[in-house]
Amino acid sequence: MSARGKARSRALEVLFEAEQRSVSAFDAMTARREKTDLVINPYTVEIVEGVVSMQATIDEFLQTYAQGWTLERMPSVDRIILRIGAWELLYNDEVPDGVAVSEAVALAKTMSTDESPAFINGLLGRLQKLKPSLLA
């Protein structure tokens, strides 16, 4: 797994832990730093900060374009993978759009249900097509 792939996985873990424990993502990241001697990859921090800062907008896009699904009905892991993928797709110009989608699908293949990769691919693919109008 690439360094950025590992950073995405760690960001997923931090955001998932924060959601499950009802704490801020920054508190979850701080707790992780204190529990281990491992240095948190700067890209993990960038993802967490980006997702947190744009979460309301990202959630609105996901809610609008997830046909037949509410955010609350989605498995937590899928919801967080979608947030990470949407942030990379829409707000991180360093990551090509196709890479943002494929990396989110790869995370879903290893971290979620058998049905999740197709769902995540479809929803992020839709956001990718609509990107110019979403960011206008």
Curated annotation (Swiss-Prot):
One annotated GO biological process: transcription antitermination
Regions crossing the membrane: none
Keywords: RNA-binding, Transcription, Transcription antitermination, Transcription regulation
GO annotation, cellular component aspect: cytosol
Single annotated GO MF: RNA binding
Pfam families: NusB
InterPro entries, per the entry: NusB-like_sf, NusB_fam, NusB_RsmB_TIM44
PANTHER family: ANTITERMINATION NUSB DOMAIN-CONTAINING PROTEIN, N UTILIZATION SUBSTANCE PROTEIN B-RELATED
Known function: Involved in transcription antitermination. Required for transcription of ribosomal RNA (rRNA) genes. Binds specifically to the boxA antiterminator sequence of the ribosomal RNA (rrn) operons.
Family membership noted in the UniProt record: Belongs to the NusB family.
Annotated protein name in UniProt: Transcription antitermination protein NusB
Natural source organism: Paenarthrobacter aurescens (strain TC1)
